[in-house]
From Swiss-Prot:
CDD domains documented for this protein: PBP2_SsuA
Cystine pairs: none
Compartments where found: Periplasm
Signal peptide: 1-21
The organism of origin for this protein: Escherichia coli (strain K12)
One example of a Gene Ontology biological process annotation: sulfur compound metabolic process
Protein name, UniProt field: Putative aliphatic sulfonates-binding protein
Family the entry assigns: Belongs to the bacterial solute-binding protein SsuA/TauA family.
SUPFAM superfamilies cross-referenced by the UniProt entry: Periplasmic binding protein-like II (SSF53850)
Listed InterPro entries: ABC_SsuA_sub-bd, Solute-binding_3/MltF_N, SsuA/THI5
Length: 319
């Protein structure tokens, strides 16, 4: 079995999902990742980047959520990171010099609004007047806002409670909030613990997906290298399908979560390929940014197109 895995990894390192030109590796790459960043976590665990770029010092920094990660990116503590759709909008509004370098399609089943199993709240419309916990400026913020709009409610119709995932989980379990908007693997952990009910997931909410962000100077200097790094993340993510059981065991160990939680998480998010941000994705992200501005959740309008980095080696529709 070990030989099979080694052969699979060797094959991954020889294939690129991005059209990567000849790469010159920088001296270092500092990567920000989250517990739920499957492709990144597997790439880190298998040391795929370290093997592909032995001349570069690869370092990894874990963050609890996207907003904290992009703060680190803005102050120069990391070079590259992955977040949901909302953190880069808040970061751009705050003046961060970052660029979008890649996107994954949305995984609507991996992000939800939870309520207690015996809660009288049966629909999103029932959230009116209730306390809802979530990480401010995260993709769950967008999930909640879009779900409220779909149900005919305004953001001001609820009592938002801004908490990190860990603090939100505690508040939810203690009954201090009425609902919790959250993403995986926190969602799967709560689901398997029991006593919760999914009020709404991301289906039909037209979210953008997850983005890969880089400091602009780093991206401009290391374009081909970044393409290769993103291709490696996609290849690592594919292991969840080709080597599912081994990936579950490895992720359970590295994330410190039970294997059933990881299995549930993988069921919610099929592996996908990271792609360049095209005009269609940029337009959808602009709609999201405008929605947040209209609800006075960001201080000013932002132009997403100003922050889209396009690898010149790729063919297809450019911005």
């Amino acid at each position: 079995m070990r030989n099979i895995i080694k052969l699979a990894l060797a094959g991954l390192l020889s294939v690129s999902t991005f059209a990567v030109a000849a790469e010159s590796s920088p001296e270092a790459l500092r990567i920000g990742y989250q517990k739920g960043s499957i492709g990144m976590v597997l790439a880190k665990s298998h040391q795929l980047l370290e093997k592909r770029y032995p001349e570069s010092k690869i370092s990894w920094v874990e963050f609890p959520a996207g907003p904290q990660m992009l703060e680190a990116l803005n102050v120069g503590s990391i070079d590259l990171g992955s977040t949901g759709d909302i953190p880069p909008i808040f970061a751009q509004a705050a003046g961060a010099d970052l660029v979008y370098v890649g996107v994954e399609p949305p995984k609507p089943k991996a992000e939800v609004i939870l309520v207690a199993e015996n809660s009288p709240i049966k629909t999103v419309a029932d959230l009116k007047g209730h306390k809802v916990a979530f990480q401010k400026g995260s993709s769950s913020h967008n999930l909640l806002l879009r779900a409220l709009r779909q149900a005919g409610l305004k953001f001001t119709d609820i009592q938002p409670t801004y908490l990190t995932p860990a603090d939100a989980r505690a508040a939810f379990q203690q009954g201090n909030v009425d609902a919790w908007a959250i993403w995986d693997p926190y969602y799967s952990a709560a689901l398997l613990q029991g006593g919760v009910r999914v009020l709404k997931d991301g289906t039909d909410l037209n979210q953008t997906g997850s983005f890969y962000l880089a400091a602009r100077p780093y991206a401009e200097k290391n374009g081909a290298f970044i393409q290769g790094v993103l291709a490696t993340f996609s290849e690592a993510d594919a292991l969840t399908r080709s080597q599912r059981e081994q990936s579950i065991a490895l992720l359970a160990k590295t994330m410190g979560l039970p294997a059933p939680v990881i299995a549930s998480y993988l069921d919610h998010r099929p592996p996908t390929t990271i792609k360049p941000v095209n005009a269609e994705v940029a337009a959808l992200q602009q709609q999201t940014a405008d929605l947040f501005y209209e609800n006075r959740l960001v201080p000013k309008k932002v132009d997403i197109r100003q922050r889209i980095w396009q690898p010149t080696q790729l063919e297809g529709k450019q911005l």
